């Protein structure tokens, strides 16, 4: 499985925003470690926004283009459609629900068979979760203290498109997410513009 291997904190500082959600990710940014502030060209700005969006979901370029192409074909705004498709990836929803402390950990949980969708094991991080699908922790995996602690200590859970069931160690996608509900700082219009001449 192809994956992004760059150090998370270094990536955050290079992109100028905290894409991994860790409170210490931008700690050294004030010491000149953050990306160069020089003026970017229009292309450079579009490229930066694309890199930021990819980094939030840790999706490789080849697969990211597939999402963009699919979003372009949708009837709704391309940017909105793209974000929805990325938000509904299984690894992302495992992370949002609180099973993993990061999207990388959530992805590993999926790959190693710890996650069930509607009671069946799914080991593909890119699996597209549909409205009404239940995401749960495999019975055997509920003995893992790390997974349990992650799930129960996520007190700041605030995703209105996900219903979290702490007693059942599960979550359900109850509706499609709205663009403004995705906790990301990206200008998706610029991302679409970046690909408009090549796709």
From Swiss-Prot:
Gene3D superfamilies from the UniProt entry: Ribosomal Protein S4 Delta 41, Chain A, domain 1, RNA-binding S4 domain
Q: Which domain of life is it from?
A: Bacteria
Q: Which residues form the S4 RNA-binding domain?
A: 88-151
Which lineage ranks, top first, belong to the organism behind this chain? Bacteria, Bacillati, Bacillota, Clostridia, Peptostreptococcales
Family in the record:
Belongs to the universal ribosomal protein uS4 family.
GO cellular component entries: small ribosomal subunit
Which GO BP terms apply?
Answer: ribosomal small subunit biogenesis; translation
Name used for this protein in its record? Small ribosomal subunit protein uS4B
Q: Which InterPro entries match?
A: Ribosomal_uS4, Ribosomal_uS4_bac-type, Ribosomal_uS4_CS, Ribosomal_uS4_N, S4_RNA-bd, S4_RNA-bd_sf
Complex formation? Part of the 30S ribosomal subunit. Contacts protein S5. The interaction surface between S4 and S5 is involved in control of translational fidelity.
Q: Which PROSITE patterns does the record match to this protein?
A: RIBOSOMAL_S4 (PS00632), S4 (PS50889)
Cite the GO molecular-function annotations of the record: rRNA binding; structural constituent of ribosome
Function field: One of the primary rRNA binding proteins, it binds directly to 16S rRNA where it nucleates assembly of the body of the 30S subunit.
Q: Which UniProt keywords apply?
A: Ribonucleoprotein, Ribosomal protein, RNA-binding, rRNA-binding
TM region(s), chain numbering = none
